Amino acid sequence: MIDDTLLEAEEKMEKAIEVAKGDFGAIRTGRANAAMFHKIMVDYYGAPTPLQQLASFQIPEARSVLITPFDRAAMSEIEKALRNSDLGVNPGNDGNVIRIVLPQLTEERRKDYIKIARTKAEDARVSLRNVRRRAKEELDRIVKDGEAGEDEVGRAEKELEAVTKKHVDAIDELLKNKEAELLAV
């Protein structure tokens, strides 16, 4: 029972790390990458659809992206979604592909992205702490119901703290790397 609780907590913490990685990947740096477009939704025949499902991405140069829609009829909607996104890009359309040239990041914009990254990191830390709190409540319930002794649960709580610290450190490392990536000119 205790092992199940710890295993479940660790799995949820791993998922929180994966979400944080995805969030950090979506934050724009000076270089183009497909993850920047991860959260952009396109109004495709009246239904909000992720851009990844409607087009393929090519990155011919560090600051340019070619987006090739699978359905040419969706091209104008994809362009509109890109213009309305918070990426700050102006897509160009040549009839077959949508071409995006990413502008250089200004110092002010870099600082804004760092603030966003810190907010995402804090959200991930809160998520980890919530998982820890729920697991601790479950361990307390196990002791209260007499399913395990206090010593056994005490060891499990120490293990839970170690796992939580490991995952918080991983979030901090992701944030540090993202900040370094954003500050690199």
Curated annotation (Swiss-Prot):
CDD domains assigned: RRF
First-listed, main subcellular location of the protein, grouped into a coarse class: cytoplasm
Cross-referenced InterPro entries: Ribosome_recyc_fac, Ribosome_recyc_fac_dom, RRF_sf
Molecular function terms, GO-annotated: ribosomal large subunit binding
Subcellular location: Cytoplasm
Alphabetized SUPFAM superfamilies for the sequence: Ribosome recycling factor, RRF
GO cellular component labels: cytoplasm
GO terms, biological process: translational termination
Record key words, sorted: Cytoplasm, Protein biosynthesis
Highest taxon in the source lineage: Bacteria
A UniProt-annotated Pfam family: RRF
Xref: NCBIfam families: frr
UniProt family annotation: Belongs to the RRF family.
Protein function: Responsible for the release of ribosomes from messenger RNA at the termination of protein biosynthesis. May increase the efficiency of translation by recycling ribosomes from one round of translation to another.
Name recorded for this polypeptide: Ribosome-recycling factor
